[in-house]
Amino acid sequence: MQRRTFLSLLALPAVAQLLQACGDDEATTDTTNGAATDPTTVMGAAARITAINSDAVAASAAINSFSADLFERLVAIDPTANLVFSPASIALALTMTSAGAVGQTLTEMNTVLHITDPASIHRSMNGLSASFDAVNKTVDNTAEGGEGTSQVELSIANSLWGQANYSFEQAFLDLLSSEYGAGMELVDYRTDPEAARVAINAWVDEQTKQRIPQLLPDGSLTVDTRLTLVNAIYLKANWANTFNDALTTPDPFSAPGGEVTAQMMHTTAELAYGEGEGWRAVEIPYVFHDLSFLVAMGDSTDVAMPAVDEAAGALAGRLVELGLPKFDIETATSLADVLKEMGMAAAFEDRDEFTGMTSEQPGLYIGNVIHQANITVDEVGTEAAAATAVIMVGESAPQEPPTPVVFTVDRPFTFWLRDRATGTVIFAGRVNDPSATR
């Protein structure tokens, strides 16, 4: 599958007046005009570097640590709500943004994102994308009498949407081109910000197979917008062993607000199962076994959930009698306040510390970070999508069968959808009520 990347930087004035103009801009780097309805793509001079999977180690570790921090903050906002987010999408968008940061802003971004080696992180993110690309496979065994098409599709897309006739640093464009495969789409926010918004949303809609049709709401772009970074992730994967839908039954689920009825899928299979202090976990593989869905559930609602590495480290093969609810949930949120609380405040201040992006004055800073994600889990497998926009603004063998472990997921649970080769958490979340649909 061809990998497309897309990075977009927009200003969102509709959110807490974060989008205010820094002043008049004068283009000093020649970016040819492009209408928002038919944007012109400008690539950096550097060719895309082919990274290898081993480059992904640092990126994977950083994303998983960032994921744990962010998960805790997001759950605390509304402990009884369903939650899904993509730490990979958010980290990719913010790491691309950090490529243009300097000074305290860069230091804080690296700390929050758990980037310990800034000099190599962009190559590592490139390697992570290469690892994700490698899981894309489709096999149709219908002709051989099999069940049909087995598929894993995982696409990562990034790009940059910039104001035409505005100065952007060549080194910044080259880095995004070589490590992220990202070109800049030139639009004209000054004369038609709404057309730019429509174009960006159309791109996200296409990349996510219509699962996220409107990342940016009405009025989110203004004449003061100069640049918007956008990442989009789409995933569709069949289970290695599909659930028999004839065995799906309406069963009780203990949600925070009281008992609800969930459509519970059932199977008995050899799975990776583990236990810890007050919690149990099971890992359900997708076809080809490159990706997995890891579920952790507490013995009671007040038990602290393990970190993903702790849960994964406790796993061992067991025969499991599994009950897992079908669910279809989504989350749409601004991450600005959360990221500030996590220690990334300088990036949201008018400090002129994104000079790696542009030498234009007044300088740019982050106005907002918008994230949407959704996930659908059923008998066949999983379909999920996520998108993140970082909005830059101006100052403005045959043997005796063992006794199966019974694991019925009938109360709130945490999940991680992981790339098994790198351990990277692609999607994570918390299901408190599987009967609530998006």
Where are these regions (language model features)?
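Bacterial N-terminal signal peptides that target proteins for export
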Residues: 1-5
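Detector for small/aliphatic-rich hydrophobic stretches
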Residues: 6-18, 22-189, 420, 437
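Extracytoplasmic/secreted cell-surface and envelope-processing proteins
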Residues: 104-109, 303, 331-333, 424-428, ...
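Non-catalytic, conformational "gating/processing" segments within enzyme and secreted inhibitor domains
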Residues: 118-297, 313-400
